[in-house]
Design a protein with these regions (language model features):
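Mature catalytic core of soluble alpha/beta enzymes
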Residues: 12-239
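Tryptophan (W) side chains
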Residues: 2-5
């Protein structure tokens, strides 16, 4: 006579059969759930031109983004920053500073003032080697915004004359965002620091949008955040 409580197999034998089966079922269930709940990380690669050079931004995120909107918004921010730091554009804050031939106090853009203060500190730390007032010499050699293409090397007299217009001590920081050129023809060339500042501003923008894994490159200058695509950091190639 058979009852629900009788069994022809010993309990240990049944456990050997059912435990692996149940474990496999649970594993499959969890795996399927994880695959649904964890979207694939997507790479967005944006490119453009600014500051007389090219830029590339790589974004890694699990969220779906409108690539056209990202391109547009980043491009607009770069345009805003270029209108501050470019020494080539006549409508930029830096260009207007450079061609204000005066020794009277005048106000400058807060971002320009930040770079001036940083440049003064760097100038002291490097014993004068870092000097953005080198702009007249850069122009003399044909690498500035003056549009001169040189076919000959500048003379010693020309170089020495240009050097008389340089020196961070010839730019005085006053109060309330005011500065004064002790030499009216003094000019600034922030090629060594403006791109880095702009990259920092773009990174702040990306972080504010919620991105945590990205690489920003402008004209060869790079900043990266996060662990890259494989979780081991961003791989940078040098040419």
């Amino acid at each position: 006579f058979w009852t629900p409580w009788t069994c022809t197999y010993p309990v240990p034998f049944l456990l050997k059969i059912f435990i692996p089966v149940i474990s496999l079922f649970i594993f499959c269930t969890i795996s399927c759930t994880d695959s649904r709940e964890q979207p694939t990380t997507k790479l967005y690669e944006l490119k453009g031109q600014a500051l007389g050079t090219t830029w590339t931004i790589k974004l890694l995120t699990k969220d779906t983004k409108d690539e056209k909107d990202l391109q547009k918004n980043i491009g607009q921010r770069l345009e805003e920053l270029e209108k501050i730091f470019s020494h080539w554009r006549p409508d930029s804050e830096l260009y207007q500073f450079n061609y204000a031939v005066t020794s009277a106090p005048f106000s400058i853009h807060p971002k320009i003032l930040e770079l001036v203060k940083h440049s003064q500190w760097m100038n002291i730390q490097t014993g004068g080697a870092f000097d953005p007032t080198i702009a007249p010499v850069v122009n003399l050699w044909g690498f500035g915004p003056v549009g001169i293409t040189r076919s000959t090397i500048p003379t010693t007299d020309q170089i020495e004359k240009s050097l008389t217009l340089t020196g961070m001590q010839k730019l005085e920081i006053l109060h309330k965002g005011m500065v004064r050129k002790k030499v009216p023809a003094l000019q600034l060339d922030f090629s060594a620091s403006a791109k880095g500042e702009i990259i920092d501003q773009i990174c702040k923008l990306l972080s504010r949008w919620g991105f945590k894994n990205y690489l920003v490159e402008i004209g060869g200058e790079i900043r990266a955040e996060g662990k890259g695509r494989k979780g081991k950091g961003w791989i940078i190639g040098l040419e």
